[in-house]
């Protein structure tokens, strides 16, 4: 009788240990898969959002037929030599507003789309890559896009300078997938225009 009770207790203990191992294994696999989904989501989010930002910048510049002279005052000295450059803040601000508005609109439209990743790809196994049921991922804007204008004059050789006007654009995005979500911030520096100029050597 005692030996039977001991045997039952041993079976219960083994079953409990086996169950605990299975639960821990499942939890570890779930965490690993979720982390992999987050990595993949952030990767594709950066590609998708960067493409939207670049297209919005190009579209806005083209729609306005923007040229360097539209954004900058070139100041000349008495000898008609270029002495300095000054950005047209008002026009740049208008351009900046148009670009951000278009980016926000495109991000909102893009949130209706989904990318699909095979579960085998998420597993990280080469054998199962591209196989299995698909996981759907959506990218949702989690706030308004922010930006900062930059005007930079750098040396490009003897008495030669390169003036560059750019925008640092930041978009906060939430990637949503079946097992949860993750947040990421996509940052991109977009050149609005640039020009190499020869400055007066006396300045």
Where are these regions (language model features)?
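Beta-strand elements of well-folded, non-transmembrane domains
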Residues: 107-111, 165, 169-177, 190-194
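Hydrophobic membrane-insertion alpha-helices, especially the h-region
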Residues: 13-30
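Short extracytoplasmic
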Residues: 42, 46-79
């Amino acid at each position: 009788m005692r030996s039977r009770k001991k045997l039952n207790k041993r079976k219960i203990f083994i079953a409990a240990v086996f169950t605990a191992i299975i639960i821990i294994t499942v939890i570890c696999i779930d965490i690993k898969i979720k982390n992999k989904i987050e990595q993949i989501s952030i990767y594709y989010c950066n590609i998708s959002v960067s493409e939207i930002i670049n297209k919005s910048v190009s579209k806005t510049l083209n729609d306005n037929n923007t040229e360097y002279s539209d954004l900058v005052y070139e100041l000349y000295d008495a000898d008609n030599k270029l002495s300095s450059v000054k950005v047209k803040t008002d026009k740049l601000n208008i351009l900046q507003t148009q670009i951000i508005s278009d980016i926000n609109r495109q991000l909102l439209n893009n949130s209706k789309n989904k990318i699909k990743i095979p579960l085998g790809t998420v597993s990280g196994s080469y054998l199962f890559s591209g196989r299995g049921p698909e996981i759907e991922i959506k990218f949702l804007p989690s706030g308004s896009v922010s930006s900062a204008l930059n005007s930079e004059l750098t040396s490009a050789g003897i008495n030669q300078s390169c003036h560059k006007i750019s925008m640092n654009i930041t978009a906060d995005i939430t990637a949503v997938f079946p097992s949860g979500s993750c947040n990421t911030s996509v940052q991109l520096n977009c050149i609005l225009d640039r020009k190499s100029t020869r400055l007066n050597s006396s300045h």
